[in-house]
């Protein structure tokens, strides 16, 4: 007889109306992980201005997101992800860890470069900060267009050419994608709104990656509305003056 699954509930940051999903890449990351695991779960949005008594009791002063697994409360996004990968494991649930360690770090400096770019108000520094962001995006593009070891035919003398894989670590979404994609989505939305910047078409690997990701429900349906992201960055994004 199959072991009964404990109740799983993910508490995430609510949007401006206190009900819909707000801007939080960590919340989206865990939302994606649970969806990809194929586990039955509930998502509860928490209005940070008006935390209910139930939420306060479960996680007093705790940072969002947090997870209720049965009667256990889990905090810290990285630890929650590790916990879910350990308890929701094969054969009943898919393993989501990337095969290639490099996939876990690909593109991870993009968000820091983006933050520096968007928070800058000095026009004299803008070009260099934009170049820094472009350089980080180019590194990701190179990774996405370079064949993974498993794509290389050792017996062939021919050049393997450009990788056509859909995601960071192959044709299936992994924990690496759950970490990177929510951040890349924020970069796209905020840069377009506050800097008129879009990811260059020349970065075909990045565009292919995003196109494949938006075609997946686990990513597209967990994204907050663009307006929520824009609102979250309204005070953060500095006007150039």
Curated annotation (Swiss-Prot):
Transmembrane segments: 26-46
Molecular-function annotations in GO: cadherin binding; chloride channel activity; oxidoreductase activity
Record-listed glutathione binding positions: 24, 64, 77
Gene Ontology cellular-component terms listed: blood microparticle; brush border; chloride channel complex; cytoplasm; endoplasmic reticulum; extracellular exosome; extracellular space; membrane
Entries under Pfam families matching the protein: CLIC-like_N (PF22441), GST_C_2 (PF13410)
Lineage top rank: taxon: Eukaryota
Family (UniProt): Belongs to the chloride channel CLIC family.
Name under which the protein is recorded: Chloride intracellular channel protein 1
Natural source organism: Homo sapiens (Human)
């Amino acid at each position: 007889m199959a072991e009964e699954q404990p109740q799983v509930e993910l508490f995430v940051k609510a949007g401006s109306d206190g009900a819909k999903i707000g801007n939080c890449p960590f919340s989206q990351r865990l939302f994606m992980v649970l969806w990809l695991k194929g586990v039955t779960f509930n998502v509860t949005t928490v209005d940070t201005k008006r935390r209910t008594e139930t939420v306060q009791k479960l996680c007093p002063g705790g940072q969002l997101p947090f997870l209720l697994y049965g009667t256990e409360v889990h905090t810290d996004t990285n630890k929650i992800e590790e916990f879910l990968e350990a308890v929701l494991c094969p054969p009943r649930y898919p393993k989501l860890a990337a095969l290639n360690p490099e996939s876990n770090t690909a593109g991870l400096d993009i968000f820091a470069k983006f933050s520096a770019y968007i928070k800058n108000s000095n026009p004299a520094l803008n070009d260099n900060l934009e170049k820094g962001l472009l350089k980080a995006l180019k590194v990701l593009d190179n990774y996405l267009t370079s064949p993974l070891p498993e794509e290389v035919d050792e017996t062939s003398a021919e050049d393997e050419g450009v990788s056509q894989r859909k995601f960071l670590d192959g044709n299936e979404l992994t924990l690496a994608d759950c970490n990177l994609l929510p951040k890349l989505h924020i970069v796209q939305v905020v840069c377009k709104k506050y800097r008129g910047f879009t990811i260059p078409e020349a970065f075909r690997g990045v565009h292919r990656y995003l196109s494949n990701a938006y075609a997946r429900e686990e990513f597209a349906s967990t994204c907050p509305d663009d307006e929520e992201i824009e609102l979250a960055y309204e005070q953060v994004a500095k006007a150039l003056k």
